Curated annotation (Swiss-Prot):
InterPro entries: TatA/B/E, TatA/E. The keyword Signal does not apply. This is Sec-independent protein translocase protein TatA. GO terms for molecular function: protein transmembrane transporter activity. It comes from Corynebacterium efficiens (strain DSM 44549 / YS-314 / AJ 12310 / JCM 11189 / NBRC 100395). Keywords: Cell membrane, Membrane, Protein transport, Translocation, Transmembrane, Transmembrane helix, Transport. It is found in: Cell membrane. The Tat system comprises two distinct complexes: a TatABC complex, containing multiple copies of TatA, TatB and TatC subunits, and a separate TatA complex, containing only TatA subunits. Substrates initially bind to the TatABC complex, which probably triggers association of the separate TatA complex to form the active translocon. One of its GO terms (cellular component) is TAT protein transport complex. Pfam families: TatA_B_E (PF02416).
């Protein structure tokens, strides 16, 4: 099934009516820019794939860090003591009377 000249003319006419004659050149220009950017990115990725990544070399005299042992004399925090020393917050719910409450 191929498109004849009348079908192509109708499709072009519909595109012009839908998008407007003023927007078509801008749309074509932006599509062209996008295609150029896409092609350049693909070429750059292919170039990156062709050059193998060189392994990083450690500088001379580099030594791996030694493991540090944790000190043994650390005390665990006592959270209960901390909360006991906190001032007591007043309970505002005790004195609150609900105005919508029926007796």
């Amino acid at each position: 099934m191929s498109l004849g000249p009348w079908e192509i003319a109708i499709i072009v006419l519909l595109i012009i009516v839908l998008f407007g004659a003023k927007k078509l050149p801008d749309a074509a220009r932006s599509i062209g820019r996008s295609m150029r950017i896409f092609k350049s990115e693909v070429k750059e990725m292919q170039k990156d794939d062709e050059t193998p990544a060189q392994p990083e070399q450690q500088p001379q005299g580099y030594q791996h860090p030694q493991q540090i042992e944790a000190p043994q004399n650390l005390q665990q925090p006592n959270f209960q003591q901390h909360y006991q020393n906190q001032p007591q917050q007043p309970d505002y719910r005790q004195n609150y009377e609900d105005p919508n409450r029926t007796p």
